[in-house]
Every structure is written in structure tokens, then in C-alpha cells.
Amino acid sequence: MEERTLFSDIDFSINLLSDHDDLSPFFCGCEELDFFFHKEVNLCVKYKYVSTYSVKNKENDILALFTLAHDSVVFQSLEDKNDFVEESCCIIDKEYIETFVRQSAFPAINIGHLAVRHDVQSRGIGTFVLNFVIGTFMEYKMSGCQFITVDSLNN
């Protein structure tokens, strides 16, 4: 069995992707994500579809890339909404439940793309990103954010 070194004790920085970041050596091994980060991400950033962030190590190597966008959880049917509210009420403060139940949509932040460089996968970097996003938006004060949504690939 291959021994893996977890990166939990190594310093990372998370920064907004800049025009100076060279993505050409970055590959995660998923064709769809690699194509997006090499061919489409700059256009999506330019037109404010997403904001893109990089995770770098001390040597300034890009270890992961991810995108964030505002989102909302909206339901097509009252039954789906009621199921969602019922499941969510156990994590909502009692003083807010009545207001929560009346909402027609629930503000969220979306992780639209998350790619970890192929040679450092399964070492906790994706978990680091998720914890960063959760921690950031638990304290976020600029706009409402009650949930985090994730666009996932089935691979």
C-alpha cells in the first residue's frame, strides 16, 4: 500500500487567481476540469460568472484550484421544500425557525469547480478547501449565506 503524507501540518495560502498565475503545469487528471481551468476559467472570471482561487504551498506551487459563485436553494415543489425544511430544522436555532420556514429561497455559496493537482491528491487538500469555504462563509457578513452547494462530477 502506498504511504501518503497528509498536508495538515503544511502551510497553504488561498488567493484569488491572478493574471500572473501560470496554470499550464496544473493538471488534476479529470479532462472536464482540466479543460475548464486551461480554456474557460479566464472568460468566466471576466464576465463574473465565478471567482477563482488557488491553493499554493510555501514554494508558490499551485496545488488546487476552485471557483465560488453566489447561489440559492430553490424548490420546484412544496413537498420538496417541506422535506428540506424538516431536515434542516435540527440545525437551525429555535428563534429563527418560523422565519426560516417562510423563506421561498435559501441563500448559498456554490463551489462550482474544485480540482486538486494529480500528484498531491488524497492528501487532505480538498478537505482543506472545504473547511476554508465553510469557515469563511460562517463568518461572512457581506451578504446572506445559509448553505454551501457543490457542483460535483460523478467520477
Language model features with spans:
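Conserved acyl-donor/pantetheine-binding loop and adjacent beta-alpha core of acyl/acetyltransferases
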Residues: 67-113
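A short helix-loop-beta-strand connector motif used in the catalytic cores of GNAT acetyltransferases and
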Residues: 42-54, 61-64, 70-79
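Conserved acetyl-CoA-binding loop-helix of GNAT-fold acetyltransferases
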Residues: 122-135
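Short hydrophobic/aromatic beta-strand element in the GNAT-like acyltransferase core
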Residues: 50-54, 65, 108, 113, ...
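Conserved GNAT acetyl-CoA-binding A-motif
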Residues: 130, 137-152
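Conserved N-terminal entry element of GNAT/NAT acetyltransferase domains
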Residues: 1-29
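Hotspots on structured nucleic-acid-binding interfaces, especially in canonical RNA/DNA-binding domains
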Residues: 30-40
